[in-house]
Amino acid sequence: MQPTAIDSKSKSHPNERVAFIQACWHKDIVDQSRKGFVAEMAKQGYAESDIDIFEVGGAFEIPLHAKLLANTGRYAGIVGAALVVDGGIYRHEFVAQSVVSALMQVQLETEVPVFSVVLTPHHFHAGEEHQKFFFDHFSHKGEEAAKTCADTLNKVRSLRRLDAQQKAAC
């Protein structure tokens, strides 16, 4: 059987929906990732109405929501966004790593692509300089996530189509 090329440039995504889950901690900053994501997805051919927004208390709640949403079969992709900072009580790196690892597990178990904008800085304080930096940084990361999301959904769609064609040929 001859290998078939994968068309990863197609922007045809009828009825594809994306879920965007964001933590409410540091909401003003995390909101920037959502805004950047939605704006870039529009450039990629998705309507704002193709994106459902969900808010959860903190980063730790994102993986469960991602899995429940993936299991609905409604979403082609899911994004999780949070800012995990050192509150001086526990190791924030552990929380961020746990969340990102759980998001990876969700996508592997459900075969629904999951994207992370769960970020943890080395140092964070609520001063004006840090606020501006993280506003801009989260907006940029939201845009990056959108580009990756649109590209991955195109590729996954093509791979599934290829798989279906090969199964039909057998």
Swiss-Prot record:
Active-site residues, Swiss-Prot/TrEMBL: R91
Residue spans crossing the bilayer: none
UniProt cross-references to SUPFAM superfamilies, sorted A to Z: Lumazine synthase
HAMAP family: Lumazine_synth
Keyword DNA repair: no
Its EC number(s): 2.5.1.78
Gene Ontology BP, a term: riboflavin biosynthetic process
UniProt keyword terms in alphabetical order: Riboflavin biosynthesis, Transferase
Pathway(s) it belongs to: Cofactor biosynthesis; riboflavin biosynthesis; riboflavin from 2-hydroxy-3-oxobutyl phosphate and 5-amino-6-(D-ribitylamino)uracil: step 1/2
Entry's family note: Belongs to the DMRL synthase family.
Name the UniProt record assigns to this protein: 6,7-dimethyl-8-ribityllumazine synthase 2
Job of this protein: Catalyzes the formation of 6,7-dimethyl-8-ribityllumazine by condensation of 5-amino-6-(D-ribitylamino)uracil with 3,4-dihydroxy-2-butanone 4-phosphate. This is the penultimate step in the biosynthesis of riboflavin.
Chain residues that bind 5-amino-6-(D-ribitylamino)uracil: W25, A59, F60, E61, L83, V84, V85, S116
NCBIfam families per the UniProt record, alphabetical: PRK12419.1 (NF009084)
Quaternary structure note: Forms an icosahedral capsid composed of 60 subunits, arranged as a dodecamer of pentamers.
Class of enzymatic activity (EC top level): transferase
Residues at which (2S)-2-hydroxy-3-oxobutyl phosphate binds: H130
Superkingdom field: Bacteria
Catalysed reactions, semicolon-separated: (2S)-2-hydroxy-3-oxobutyl phosphate + 5-amino-6-(D-ribitylamino)uracil = 6,7-dimethyl-8-(1-D-ribityl)lumazine + phosphate + 2 H2O + H(+)
GO CC terms in record: cytosol; riboflavin synthase complex
GO MF: 6,7-dimethyl-8-ribityllumazine synthase activity
